[in-house]
Amino acid sequence: MGSGGRGVRRVSDPSKVARAVAEVMRGQPGPTVVQGYLSEADDGEKRIFWVDGHIVGGYLRRRAPGAFHHNLQRGGQPEATVISESDRTICDAIAPHLRRNGIAIAGLDIIGSALVECNTLNPGGVHYAESFRDSNSMGATECPIASQVIRMLTTVPTWKLPEANPA
């Protein structure tokens, strides 16, 4: 899958979806995802940071004027956001799956009330979430995100890695 919005397209005409998918697949080998457009995307996309079972912060990404992508590499702008009860419900629902698969750090992308992406290798933007920490519902008394990540990486995990499948 791409990153930074590479390969992401908006196709309004249903008769052109197959052609758009074929073009993406030619340019990027590997899995391709096709999903319906969420009208809530017009309000932005939240990146919520999840560390070892806990939400530790987040921020909102808004599109550049006239753009389709929320990605910061494509002109999107970060803003402070509130971590809502709906966001917490989504994160709680995905948490068992993340833990079962040995994932301890994730950037969860949410549009409206839908989880649209789970970034586990390098969930970018922690510094934005850190800078907006006092503005969201996490509060100024919460431990900084980077400190929580470091603490999680340097302590005994509360979860087990999945067992490898024998080949």
Walk through the language-model features, giving the residues of each.
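Short, basic, helix/turn surface patches
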Residues: 1-5, 27, 137
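Phosphate-binding site of ATP-dependent enzymes
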Residues: 6-90, 94-98
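ATP-dependent carboxylate activation and anion-phosphoryl transfer catalytic cores
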Residues: 82-167
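Short acidic (Asp/Glu) and glycine-rich catalytic loops that position anionic groups and cofactors
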Residues: 1-2, 69-75, 119-125
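Glycine-rich beta-alpha junction loops
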Residues: 1-3, 38-41, 62-63, 112-114, ...
